[in-house]
């Protein structure tokens, strides 16, 4: 239809409380912003305390409440502490977005160290696993809920010089599928979003490997990178909302067509 301007439904997630990890920058910040615009309350979690405070201050200009919680996801007590903080702030939790990741890549596969491997797996799949376990009883008590975990085309398609990162992201997809199958009868949905968007990680890659970056950009059928707030965030909001109540165990490629139905 022509002449129709898309509008954001401000009540899509009205009354929902959502945890977002890695929320200080990039994709996480874009998701948090989109959630707040659609009526959710957000607990923003990140290890960068100073940047997180600045992000939350900016996001707090809207009508919905947003709280900051600095946390190192490598700490084995962090998952329970994060969920407890969300319940304390908002009374309950309806959704979880596991976005946080850390990596020392790009590196050649043979140069990746145990420390590199441990970093990306601890902040990625292990923290994702533990946060899902920690939030489960809260979601169950609410009669259900939704979890969105962030994957990556680096894993689904394979990206040279991101061996550990790709493995960690595919581990997150495996965890997500298993939980989705097990928790479906509990009313808890689990899905994965794989974004290709302008972010700190993408910018770092562009600086380190500009030719590879340009090749990758040319491979996007839509001809551009996604915007974290207006392209990635809305898809996550949809998956957290009742509009997607029959959607679980799916990987959604929000990449401008790069994956091409693979």
Can you name each region flagged by the protein language model?
Residues 2-9, 103-106, 157, 237, ...:
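Short C-terminal tail/terminal secondary-structure segment
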Residues 107-109, 113-118, 216:
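Substrate-binding pocket helix/loop in short-chain dehydrogenase/reductase
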Residues 122, 210-230:
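Catalytic Tyr-x(3-8)-Lys segment
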Residues 129-132, 144, 225-254, 259-260:
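C-terminal substrate-recognition "lid" of short-chain dehydrogenase/reductases
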Residues 132, 168, 176:
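Active-site helix of classical SDR
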Residues 152:
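Residue(s) in the substrate-gating loop at a strand-loop-helix junction
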Residues 184, 189, 247-249:
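Short, small/polar-rich loop/turn modules that mediate ligand/substrate recognition or access, typified
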